């Protein structure tokens, strides 16, 4: 099978709050904004924010789907998660630094950064 995964969406209760959170986190403006579904396009991948309650859907928040964002360095990772509620602290796992935070809407999001050879990063 030849396939490609091109998008994922997170359920949000408050679109304005969620858009502000992710604009700050990604350091870029939302690509498409709507009261029900807003989109960030990052490296060709579409991350959607879905205001599920506006269309009468139900949803359970938590860690059943874990988007993972890769950044270039542990310094960037630390800067991006500073002040956020961590549900998994910064930890070295094999060749990566990994942390997981809870976003403004209750979703869990992982952030990873590569460990540099001889970098003494801790």
Describe each region flagged by the PLM.
Residues 54-56:
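Short, surface-exposed beta-strand-loop junctions and turns on beta-sheet-rich folds
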Residues 47-49, 111:
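Generic preference for hydrophobic
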Residues 3, 35, 94-96:
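Loop/turn position at the start of each blade in beta-propeller repeats
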Residues 4-13, 41, 58-122:
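Vicinal oxygen chelate
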């Amino acid at each position: 099978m030849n396939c490609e995964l091109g998008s994922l969406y997170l359920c949000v209760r408050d679109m304005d709050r969620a858009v502000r959170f992710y604009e700050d986190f990604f350091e870029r403006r939302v690509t498409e904004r709507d009261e029900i579904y807003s989109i960030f396009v990052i490296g060709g991948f579409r991350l959607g924010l879905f205001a599920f309650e506006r269309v009468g859907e139900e949803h359970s928040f938590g860690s059943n789907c874990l988007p993972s964002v890769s950044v270039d360095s542990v310094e960037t990772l630390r800067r991006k998660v500073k002040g956020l509620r961590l549900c998994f602290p910064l930890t070295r796992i094999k060749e990566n630094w990994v942390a997981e935070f809870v976003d403004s809407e209750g979703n869990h999001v992982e952030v990873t950064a590569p460990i540099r050879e001889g970098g003494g990063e801790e």
